[in-house]
Regions:
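Short, well-structured beta-strand/strand-turn elements
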Residues: 136, 250-254
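Short glycine/proline- and charge-enriched loop/turn segments
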Residues: 37-42, 81-88, 220-228, 267-274
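Short functional micro-motifs and their immediate structural scaffolds
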Residues: 23-25, 67
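Extended interfacial segments that mediate partner engagement and assembly in macromolecular machines
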Residues: 45-143
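Acceptor-substrate binding/catalytic loop of class I
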Residues: 48, 223-238
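A C-terminal cap/extension of S-adenosyl-L-methionine-dependent methyltransferases
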Residues: 2-14, 32-52, 253-309
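Conserved SAM-binding loop
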Residues: 8, 12-13, 24, 100-219, ...
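Short cysteine-rich clusters marking metal-coordination/redox-active sites
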Residues: 16-19, 59
Length: 309
């Protein structure tokens, strides 16, 4: 396991990343960061919960929960570039979940000429897009770990680095996707605005993200896995709609998202002492329940909007 890069982190005050307001309705959660416990998996996708997070405030105007203060963006970039990756099977499961959502929306796309996935990981979702019928698929991913795990075809299709519209063709994409990534981006409004410029008329931007107002998050409170050192903001239905509407998307829809994962993965997300977690995982393996697939609405949202036709 890789050691976290440069454990020296500074925090600076921040206004709302969606609307720019400094008006706060409440503090959602207080800071809990233990720098000595950071590892190479701390900034990896679909990891076991660590229980570390920034102080998060809820914006009074747009209802997004955001880290304030937040870490230096250069420090964050270093963590993502050097993050470990050990979730190939879970990456494929996530891609299948997202593929089902895309198939339900295919009839509303202008065509299946070109698609871009922001935060592409090892490219598992690019494989799904090809099977759906997209003629040209591209991705962008900053972390070296998942890129090393990608197939040769996907390594060629994925731009290494952080998303910049300068690297992609303006007005050419029928579909841009961003799955469990908007929580990690410092300037999420800027990203959403730049994606709009990449879409062809009638093109679709699809987001899947955590919902801090979901029942699971409200019940588990600070023990919920959505409160994580990777997350600079968390959304609700209201704030995700605000993000898309304020930037200029049309025909916006927001809804809960169901995930289909093995029981072993779901159990990994349950907050409990390590010894109990290990015992539970062993029991699931012995009883052959670990790979039993279960669909749950565990507290995610999907939201989409179209560019003007």
């Amino acid at each position: 396991m890789t050691a976290v890069q440069n454990k020296s982190m500074s925090l600076t005050p921040r206004v709302c990343p969606l609307c720019g307001s400094s008006r706060v309705s409440s503090v959602l959660i207080d800071e809990d960061i233990r720098m000595s416990e950071l590892t190479g998996l701390s900034f990896a996708s679909r990891k076991a919960p660590e229980g570390m997070h920034y102080k998060m405030a809820i914006c009074e105007l747009c209802d997004v929960a955001y880290a304030n203060p937040a870490p230096d963006i250069r420090w964050l970039h270093d963590q993502y570039v050097n993050a470990d990756f050990d979730t190939v099977s879970e990456s494929r499961d996530a891609a299948q979940n997202h593929g089902r959502l895309i198939r339900s929306l295919l009839g509303r796309l202008p065509d299946v000429d070109r698609a871009l996935d922001i935060g592409a990981g090892d490219g598992a979702f690019l494989d799904v897009l090809r099977r759906i019928g997209f003629r040209q698929v591209e991705g962008v991913e900053p972390s070296e770990g998942p890129l090393r795990a990608a197939s040769d075809e996907n390594q060629k299709a994925i731009q290494k680095g952080f998303f910049s519209e300068m690297d992609f063709a303006v007005g050419k994409y029928s579909l841009v996707t961003c799955f469990q990534t908007v929580e990690h981006v410092e300037d999420v409004r800027g990203l959403t605005r730049r994606v709009l410029r990449l879409l062809k008329p009638g093109g679709l931007f699809l987001i899947v993200c955590h919902n801090f107002r979901a029942l699971t998050a409200r019940l588990l409170k600070q023990r919920s896995p959505i409160f994580d050192i990777e997350h600079l903001q968390l959304f609700s239905s209201a704030s995700l709609h605000y993000l898309l509407d304020d930037v200029g998307y049309e025909h916006i829809a927001i809804a809960p998202f169901s995930n289909h994962y093995p029981l072993g993965y779901w159990f990994k997300l349950v907050p409990m002492p390590t010894r109990l977690q290990d015992l539970g995982q062993r029991l699931l393996c012995v009883t052959k329940l670990s790979q039993l697939y279960v669909s749950l609405r565990a507290g995610n949202l999907y939201g989409y909007g179209f560019s003007r036709s």
